[in-house]
Amino acid sequence: MNGVDINSNLDSIKAKAEDIRNLLLTTSTGNWEDILGHFVVLSGEYGSLVREVNNIYDSVAVFPEQVTGDPNLIPNLLRTKLSPELETKNRDIINQYVSKNSTHYDPGNQEENIPPLKLHIKSFNDRIDKVDQEFENKIQQISKHKLTKPSASHDTAILKDILSITMLGSGIKINAQQQLAQQQQQQATINALQQQQRLLNAQQQQQQQQQPQALYKLPATNTANTSTNTPSSTIVINSPSPGGIHHNVPTPPTNLNAAGTRTSPPNVQQYVNSPPPQQQQQQQINTVIGTPNTIPTTPTATVSTAATYKPVASPQQQVTSKQVPIQSTNKPLPQQQPSIQIQPQQSIVQMVQNVLPNTTSPPVNNNNQSPINSGIGGGQFKPSAINIANANSGTSTIQQQIQLQQQQLQQQIQLQQQLAQQQQQNQQNQQNQQNQQNQQNQQIHQHIQHLTPQQQAQLQQQMLQQQQLQQQFQQQQLSQQLLQQQQLHQQQQPNQTIQNPFHNFQANNFRVQNPTNFNPPQNQ
């Protein structure tokens, strides 16, 4: 009871209640804010009073220390068991249940008690299953009829814009600036497309102009020994390129003026020596892989003559085949693939110009003037007819030799790659050995500091012996590497001599004959 001032709280409550009463009596039109303020004050005072009264209850609460045996004297809140009437009633119910079931279960006969017990358990389980099934059915019905809250899949801002457009019509009209911007954007896209189309057309025209014409008109000759000319006919000679890729390399013929003079062709070697686009692409691929860029060019038969003439060859003039040695140095750089240098093959026109003598064109006989003109040598020579079959056979043999050369080059590259790998491995091993030696030396120096002078001398002798053994082992490794390099060098030596692909080429087919004594044979 100490510390509790109930009188002051009661007096304040009474005073506040009187103030509220006087306020209600005096004011005809009540102000809701004033009324709420007064009731808030009153409720606060009442709450403080309740807290003080609860403290009083804690100090006044009592409980019995001893309970009598008579239940009638014990209050209901302190009882721990039922009343005697309920206990007797419960006891009677239990006795009735036991008396009913005592006939089914005989403790003396256990075998007879098992079947009825099983039936009882089965019926009990069946009822439980039915109850479970009913619960499941009810849960399914509830889940079917359950209402789900729709998810807001659309953005509220978009919905607001749609409502404002449909209800108020806002945002339908487009400003003049927006219209101009849209028109400018459309015009820019149209101009860009037109410019791209123009560039494509210009590139196609340039490609068409750069491609050489595959057909040239040549004046045909009569079979009879006359000076009359027949109408011109077109002849196309196809020369196969290596790898089975066929490409047309035509030769523009020399033109004759009305006076019988010869005009120069438009740069014959530009068309002869230029490789086909397929070969250029192959060269680019080889540069990426690592193969040498210098691939022998394909010999192309740039001859435009009549197929009815037979060649007139002299046995004294022939070209012998020679072997072209390769100038390669077997000194690969460390950790770098060695490069192979191969002399580029000469074209047929250059070989012919080197073989043939530098002679000027002989005087033209007006009686036996031959209308056949060749584009070889810029119009300086007038060779006789060429056997096209021999030229084709020569190109086939050249293709085979080029393939063999490529195989040999690939073998050399593989061998050199193996050498480079071995060198890298050796360098790594040497570095590892050096690291191990450094670690051992550090450990030895640490141990030497704690040893006597005699022990230090013994350790130095042992270290010298180990160094001598290591030097011997390194010398053996170097000798083995030298032997391997010599063996590889011996294997590469027979592959370094590559035959000249033009050894089957006969210069007699391009040899100049005296036009005064030349009489072309008739057709058989």
Curated annotation (Swiss-Prot):
It is found in: Nucleus. Residues 356-374 have a biased composition (Low complexity). Its main location: nucleus. This is Putative mediator of RNA polymerase II transcription subunit 8. Component of the Mediator complex, a coactivator involved in the regulated transcription of nearly all RNA polymerase II-dependent genes. Mediator functions as a bridge to convey information from gene-specific regulatory proteins to the basal RNA polymerase II transcription machinery. Mediator is recruited to promoters by direct interactions with regulatory proteins and serves as a scaffold for the assembly of a functional preinitiation complex with RNA polymerase II and the general transcription factors. It comes from Dictyostelium discoideum. Keywords: Activator, Coiled coil, Nucleus, Transcription, Transcription regulation, Ubl conjugation pathway. Component of the Mediator complex. May be part of a multisubunit E3 ubiquitin-protein ligase complex. Residues 312-340, 356-379, 430-451 are annotated as: Disordered. GO terms for biological process: protein ubiquitination. Residues 314-333 have a biased composition (Polar residues). Residues 117-146, 175-211, 398-478 form a coiled coil.
